[in-house]
UniProtKB/Swiss-Prot annotation:
Gene3D superfamilies: P-loop containing nucleotide triphosphate hydrolases. Belongs to the EutP/PduV family. ATP binds at residues 8-15. It comes from the Bacteria. Keywords: ATP-binding, Bacterial microcompartment, Kinase, Nucleotide-binding, Transferase. NCBIfam families: EutP, PRK15467.1. This is Probable acetate kinase EutP. InterPro entries: EutP_PduV (IPR012381), P-loop_NTPase (IPR027417). GO terms for molecular function: acetate kinase activity; ATP binding. It comes from Escherichia coli (strain K12). Pathway: Amine and polyamine degradation; ethanolamine degradation. GO terms for cellular component: bacterial microcompartment.
Length: 159
């Protein structure tokens, strides 16, 4: 599998998803620095996203990854996507994940519309990171991409 970076605002659910994809469904602690797993995937701090003074750190961190997974809470009506981020990652596969779909104030339809307007494409994944079946949809999708690319099939953004 290629290297993945998880990006999104503070509290979006990046670390919870990062952990869930590794089979860890315990409560996530706040990410204070860039963290890596055994495969080299990267969990980025939300501060990199929320504060323009940290954009350079975010851009530098994303240089060597193959895929961006953008995590946006279904209970967050605003886009905080740094200007130009999708352009920087134009050669990288970009996947949008709508997290926190189980929250009482979640508005999945509005979040999907916001992400489409921002420039993300389908498929998008609606997740409750504490529900293994919900997370499995993303796991299966990532595995299918890997299998296609290993078989030499072209996928969107494959090189």
């Amino acid at each position: 599998m290629k290297r993945i970076a998880f990006v999104g605002s503070v509290g979006a659910g990046k670390t919870t998803l990062f952990n869930a994809l590794q089979g860890n469904y315990t409560l996530a602690r706040k990410t204070q620095a860039v963290e890596f797993n055994d495969k080299g995937d990267i969990d980025t701090p939300g501060e990199y996203f929320n504060h323009p003074r940290w954009y350079h750190a975010l851009i530098t961190t994303l240089q060597d990854v193959d895929m961006l997974i953008y995590v946006h809470g279904a209970n967050d009506p605003e886009s905080r996507l740094p200007a130009g981020l999708l352009d920087i990652g134009v050669s990288k596969r970009q996947i949008a994940v709508i997290s926190k779909t189980d929250m009482p104030d979640a508005d999945v339809a509005a979040t999907r519309k916001l992400l489409l307007e921002t420039g993300f494409e389908e498929p998008m994944f609606e997740l409750n990171s504490h529900d293994p079946q919900s997370v499995q949809q993303l796991v299966d999708y990532l595995a299918s991409l890997t299998k296609q690319e290993e078989a030499g099939e072209k996928t969107h953004h494959s090189e």
